[in-house]
């Protein structure tokens, strides 16, 4: 098993209990670069680490995310020239809005070993909370494909490596499974690898969990395992 190390700070740092945007006076970009370099150095020879992600779901960065990400990447490369680095886009890394918020998000990597990562959920507000049922969420069998498509177009335009590192659907309506089935066929055709959210026994009754219960697979597993 290998893991992705990803700081789940959303482009921010909690300073004295306050969420503070990276790139502001209190949390300068050089502080993020220092952190990134130290993480890279600490795990440089660890074979269990598949990749370093620069950040989980940065958002509302006031236009600072590209500069922040480049500084983090530069610091990683100073410590480790071989590790795969994942570069998430601004505004929650949404695939559906990638071209709107990340159209110029191309980083300079001297190692040429970077993948651009997106996330996508298929409910009405793309949050992954799935507050409404399938119909009220405006879902359809092709909604997954339609929302990923802008990201796929951008990838082709720039000929860069890519990965969908987070997506998930509720287990309580089989129509979500059909959406996922069509999405995974599309991702295979576009050569976009993927990671499903989420697994692990700590999720309990979480509707998106792929964890088995009492030895019985979650419904979504029948779809996911058919695309291994």
Give the residues covered by each predicted segment.
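Extracellular glycoside hydrolase catalytic/binding regions
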Residues: 20-25, 30-51, 55-192, 206-226
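Conserved beta-strand edge residues that scaffold enzyme active sites
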Residues: 10-11, 169, 201
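Aromatic-lined carbohydrate-binding surfaces of glycoside hydrolases
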Residues: 1-18
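His/Asp/Glu-enriched short active-site or ligand-binding loop at hydrolase and phosphoryl-transfer sites
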Residues: 194-198
């Amino acid at each position: 098993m290998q893991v992705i190390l990803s700081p789940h700070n959303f482009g921010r740092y909690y300073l004295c209990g306050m969420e503070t945007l990276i790139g502001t006076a209190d949390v300068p970009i050089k502080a993020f670069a220092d952190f990134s370099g130290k993480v890279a150095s600490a795990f440089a020879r660890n074979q269990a680490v598949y990749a370093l992600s620069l950040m989980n779901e940065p958002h509302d960065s006031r236009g600072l995310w590209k500069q922040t990400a480049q500084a983090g990447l530069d610091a990683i490369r100073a410590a480790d020239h071989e590790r795969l680095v994942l570069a998430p886009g601004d505004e929650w890394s949404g695939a559906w809005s990638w071209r709107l918020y990340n159209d110029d998000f191309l980083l300079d990597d001297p190692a040429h070993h970077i993948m651009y990562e997106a996330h996508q959920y298929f409910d009405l507000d793309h949050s992954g909370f799935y507050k409404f049922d399938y119909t009220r969420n405006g879902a359809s069998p092709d909604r997954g494909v339609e929302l990923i498509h802008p990201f796929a177009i951008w990838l082709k335009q720039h000929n860069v490596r890519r990965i969908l590192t987070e997506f998930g659907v509720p287990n309580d309506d089989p129509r979500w499974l059909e959406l996922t089935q069509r999405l995974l066929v599309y991702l295979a055709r576009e050569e976009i690898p993927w990671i499903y959210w989420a697994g692990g026994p700590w999720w309990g009754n979480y509707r998106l969990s792929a964890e088995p219960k009492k030895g019985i697979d979650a419904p979504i597993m029948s779809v996911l395992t058919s695309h291994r």
